Amino acid sequence: MFNKLHLVSLLACGLFVIAQANTVKKCEKKMPASLKSQLCEIRKYKLLDTPDMDKHMDCVMKALDFVRPDGTGDYHKLIKPLNAIEKDRKHDFNLEKCGGQTQHLPVGKRANAYYKCLVESTSGDAFKKVFDTVELVKAKKLPALSQYSSVVDKLMKKIDDKICN
């Protein structure tokens, strides 16, 4: 009896997590009004330091699964994809540095600060490629195990053109 109850509980939790799954598109739909006019710039990695951007990037970074529920960066979710784009020890250093710099910030500011730190780091170009690839995978525009390629750039351009024009 206990095992059946335990199994039902686990299944219910799993379904709840699936129902809560987010995408960048969902985050953009509920982004604060103050950012709506800047969506194109934000999608092109313009960095903003406002409470509304903190809220938006918290949603986005959680949707992409790059940060934990408390907004702290998740080293293990990014190191392998970064090294798949460019094998370099700098990624380890930058993930550690950005994680360390942001982990003691207020919870609502962590994800945006982590994002900004990575974009501005020497891993920035590789991070943007990982970010775009994962965004497309989460939106089901690419298969789950996809890696960065020129297809990512083409799909992102198509999405950005639709949003920005």
UniProtKB/Swiss-Prot annotation:
GO terms for cellular component: extracellular region. Serotonin binds at E28, H56, Y115, D132, E135. The keyword Aminoacyl-tRNA synthetase does not apply. The keyword Lipid biosynthesis does not apply. Disulfide bonds join C27-C59, C40-C164, C98-C117. Keywords: Blood coagulation cascade inhibiting toxin, Disulfide bond, Hemostasis impairing toxin, Secreted, Signal, Toxin. Residues 1-21 form the signal peptide. Histamine binds at Y115, D132, E135. Female salivary gland. Not detected in female carcass without salivary glands. Not detected in male tissues. It is found in: Secreted. Its main location: secreted. GO terms for molecular function: odorant binding; toxin activity. Pfam families: PBP_GOBP. Transmembrane segments: none annotated. Belongs to the PBP/GOBP family. Modulates blood feeding of female mosquitoes on vertebrate species by binding and sequestering different mediators involved in the host response. Binds serotonin and histamine. Increases blood clotting time. This is Short form salivary protein D7R1. It comes from Anopheles gambiae (African malaria mosquito). The gene is D7r1.
